Amino acid sequence: MKLTHVDEKGVKMVEVGHKKDMYRRAIAKGRIKLKPETIKLIREGKIEKGNVLAAAQIAGILAVKKTFDIIPLCHPIPLTGVDITFDFGEDYIEVTCEVRAIYKTGVEMEALTGVSVALLTIWDMVKAVEKDEKGQYPYTKIEEIRVVEKIKEERS
């Protein structure tokens, strides 16, 4: 297998100018484990810092838009849509980030960046109630960040 970002001259951004614009979609998911009491506070809108889910959605969308600034060899991509959604478990929130574009390269890095930043934002918003008496986070954990779907298709 040949690496596309590295050659004998060093690191490079892959040339995609010759590629055809195609519909691209990627969906990434990840979870944050939280204390059940914290989940309850989020659902009831009682986190002192503010609306946890709205903050996570905004942060995730912004992160998707800035992926090319964060990951050095990613192309700036003209996005057509981003959705950040949440599913609750007893002791976790699962975040899903769906990214869409019509472009020459895929959007999976954007979806992974969006879900990661949304999860980090949730952590930031709830850290006051997640800390133990020593200021540590024995229960809080971000896990299972992954791409669950990637689509590339021609559209007429």
Curated annotation (Swiss-Prot):
Keywords: Lyase, Molybdenum cofactor biosynthesis. It catalyses: (8S)-3',8-cyclo-7,8-dihydroguanosine 5'-triphosphate = cyclic pyranopterin phosphate + diphosphate. One of its GO terms (molecular function) is cyclic pyranopterin monophosphate synthase activity. SUPFAM superfamilies: Molybdenum cofactor biosynthesis protein C, MoaC. The active site is at D124. InterPro entries: Mo_CF_biosynth-C_arc, MoaC, MoaC_sf, MoCo_biosynth_MoaA/MoaC, Mopterin_CF_biosynth-C_dom. Substrate binds at L73, C74, H75, M109, E110. It comes from the Archaea. GO terms for biological process: Mo-molybdopterin cofactor biosynthetic process. Pathway: Cofactor biosynthesis; molybdopterin biosynthesis. Gene3D superfamilies: Molybdopterin cofactor biosynthesis C (MoaC) domain. The keyword Lyase applies. It is an enzyme of class 4 (lyase). Its EC number is 4.6.1.17. It holds the Pfam family MoaC. Catalyzes the conversion of (8S)-3',8-cyclo-7,8-dihydroguanosine 5'-triphosphate to cyclic pyranopterin monophosphate (cPMP). Homohexamer; trimer of dimers. Belongs to the MoaC family. HAMAP family: MoaC_A. This is Probable cyclic pyranopterin monophosphate synthase. It comes from Pyrococcus furiosus (strain ATCC 43587 / DSM 3638 / JCM 8422 / Vc1). The gene is moaC.
